[in-house]
């Protein structure tokens, strides 16, 4: 019997505030709503989905390292503000060598200059930004397609 595909969704700092934080930029959908929808989609495709959110860089790194040990097949990550600052996140993602998609609710290229650079994009399998919460659904669909190839 083959193991079910496993996808991990990682959420960075302040994403726990979705729905109440700058809804004009990030929308009104909560993180719980996003995770619930992704869970439903994953279940329908017979894929194991786990989610993790932290406001702390080291905890995100620890969880990504654990993903390798757990046999996770794909990571979907919204690194939040760490997108623009964290060489450590880049290093752990490169180190575990699990394919990943970088997701952003807002279009980081239409925002402040400092938000236009990502330390992760050039090593990501794909990048989705500016599509709001549906970006996560598209990332999940792409991950499942890639895993099941």
UniProtKB/Swiss-Prot annotation:
Record-stated family:
Belongs to the type-II 3-dehydroquinase family.
Task: State the UniProt keywords alphabetically.
Answer: Amino-acid biosynthesis, Aromatic amino acid biosynthesis, Lyase
Please give the biological process terms from Gene Ontology that the record holds.
Answer: amino acid biosynthetic process; aromatic amino acid family biosynthetic process; chorismate biosynthetic process; quinate catabolic process
Organism this protein belongs to: Polynucleobacter necessarius subsp. necessarius (strain STIR1)
EC number(s) per UniProt? 4.2.1.10
Cite the InterPro entries for this sequence. DHquinase_II, DHquinase_II_CS, DHquinase_II_sf
Kindly list the residue ranges recorded as spanning the membrane. Answer: none
Q: CDD domains, alphabetically?
A: DHQase_II
Q: How does it assemble?
A: Homododecamer.
* Gene name for this UniProt entry: aroQ
Record-linked NCBIfam families: aroQ, PRK05395.1-1, PRK05395.1-2, PRK05395.1-3, PRK05395.1-4
- The identity of this protein, by name, is 3-dehydroquinate dehydratase
Q: What is the lineage of its organism?
A: Bacteria, Pseudomonadati, Pseudomonadota, Betaproteobacteria, Burkholderiales
What positions does UniProt annotate as the active site of this protein? 26 (proton acceptor), 104 (proton donor)
* Catalytically driven reaction(s): 3-dehydroquinate = 3-dehydroshikimate + H2O
Q: What does this protein do?
A: Catalyzes a trans-dehydration via an enolate intermediate.
| Pathway membership, UniProt | Metabolic intermediate biosynthesis; chorismate biosynthesis; chorismate from D-erythrose 4-phosphate and phosphoenolpyruvate: step 3/7
Swiss-Prot/TrEMBL site (Transition state stabilizer) positions: 21
Q: Which superkingdom?
A: Bacteria
Any single GO molecular-function term of the entry would be: 3-dehydroquinate dehydratase activity
What the entry lists under Pfam families is as follows: DHquinase_II
* Matches recorded under HAMAP family: AroQ (MF_00169)
Q: Which residues hold substrate?
A: 78, 84, 91, 105-106, 115
């Amino acid at each position: 019997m083959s193991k079910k595909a496993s996808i991990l969704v990682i959420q960075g700092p302040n994403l726990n505030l979705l729905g109440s934080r700058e809804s004009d930029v990030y929308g009104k959908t909560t993180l719980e709503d996003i995770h619930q929808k992704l869970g439903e989609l994953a279940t329908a495709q017979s894929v194991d989905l786990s989610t993790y959110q932290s406001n702390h860089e080291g905890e995100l790194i620890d969880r990504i390292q654990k993903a390798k040990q757990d046999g996770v097949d794909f990571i979907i990550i919204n690194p939040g503000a760490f997108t623009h600052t964290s060489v450590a996140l880049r290093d752990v993602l490169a180190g575990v060598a699990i394919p990943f998609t970088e997701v952003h609710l807002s279009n980081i290229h239409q925002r402040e200059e400092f938000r236009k650079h990502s330390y992760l994009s050039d090593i990501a399998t794909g990048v989705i930004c500016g599509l709001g919460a549906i970006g996560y659904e598209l990332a999940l669909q792409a991950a499942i397609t890639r895993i099941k190839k």
